[in-house]
């Protein structure tokens, strides 16, 4: 039953994303259930596809700016939970391949000595985005105020190294549809946080391809590569979840093959900010 449900959901995503190509650039909205990753651990990006801005969002008498259209096939490589001792190897692989990525960063205190790597990543043209200061579900999901306090602390800790005022993208720990947060903040905590994020001008970013590099067992580089290929399937618009934490060094080893595979399939590499607009 679980396998059948997974295939049905993936089919729905493929259909909806295919239809979405007929629309202008817009936002992914978080509404999809978990696909391809462990429940309560990882969540996919939702399946709404591209939509045009609502007429009410365009001031009367003005001509809205038209952002560049994304390529027909694009992929965003995203990395959570860094910087760490793994990050230099990830940056080396990306830079060698001339690929730009998006890093959803943490500042837990344990990785303080690696925070200067954020300046290196930003200087190389990679996108820096918010993840969490603590990444402790029991702390950040106690209440909306607790979440925003955590984000403010993250911003403060990374401010010496990157331009934090311009960061308008974030990724909720566990994804925007995680259910583990209900243990601490109640059933409606994520809906409330998503609404508040939009009100504050943030775009929350999930994913539809999971490398499964942080689900336990320390998977090999070849396993991570196969996971990415399998999860991509026939999709043509992909946000790939990977990690550059201290325990996911094999992710860096898998990157050259992952990048080459996407290139062979005709994908263009993009930063998240190039394909998903802010509210």
Describe every region a protein language model picked out:
Residues 1, 5, 37, 41-43, ...:
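Intrinsically disordered, low-complexity Ser/Thr/Pro-rich tracts
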Residues 135-241, 245-261, 267-268, 274-277:
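Catalytic domains of cell-wall/extracellular-matrix polysaccharide-remodeling enzymes
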Residues 17-28:
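Hydrophobic alpha-helical membrane-insertion segments, chiefly the h-region
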Residues 35-40, 64, 231:
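Extended, non-globular alpha-helical segments
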Residues 41-172, 275-277:
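Active-site beta->alpha N-cap acidic-glycine motif
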């Amino acid at each position: 039953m679980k396998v059948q449900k997974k295939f049905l959901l993936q089919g729905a995503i493929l259909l909806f994303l295919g239809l979405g190509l007929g629309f202008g650039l817009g936002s992914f909205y978080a509404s999809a259930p978990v696909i391809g990753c462990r429940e309560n651990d990882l969540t996919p990006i939702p399946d709404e596809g591209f939509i045009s801005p609502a007429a009410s969002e365009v001031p009367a008498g003005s001509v809205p700016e038209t952002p560049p259209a994304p390529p027909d096939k694009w992929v965003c490589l995203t990395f959570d939970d860094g910087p760490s001792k793994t990050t230099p190897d990830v940056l080396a692989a990306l830079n060698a391949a001339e690929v730009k990525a998006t890093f959803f960063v943490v500042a837990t205190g344990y990785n303080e000595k690696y925070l200067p790597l954020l300046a290196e990543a930003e200087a190389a043209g990679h996108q820096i985005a918010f993840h969490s200061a603590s990444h402790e579900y029991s702390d950040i999901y106690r209440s909306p105020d607790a979440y925003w306090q955590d984000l403010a602390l993250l911003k403060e800790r990374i401010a010496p190294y990157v331009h934090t005022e311009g960061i308008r993208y974030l990724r909720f720990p566990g994804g925007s549809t995680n259910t583990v947060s209900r243990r601490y903040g109640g059933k409606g905590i994520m809906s409330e946080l998503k609404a508040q994020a939009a009100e504050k001008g943030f775009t929350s970013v999930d994913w539809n391809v999971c490398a499964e590099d942080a689900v336990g067992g320390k998977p090999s580089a070849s396993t991570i590569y196969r996971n990415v290929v399998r999860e991509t399937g026939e999709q043509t618009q992909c946000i790939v979840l990977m990690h550059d934490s201290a325990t996911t060094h094999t992710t860096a080893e898998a990157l050259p093959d992952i990048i080459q595979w996407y290139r062979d399939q005709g994908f263009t590499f993009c930063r998240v900010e190039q394909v998903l607009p802010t509210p």
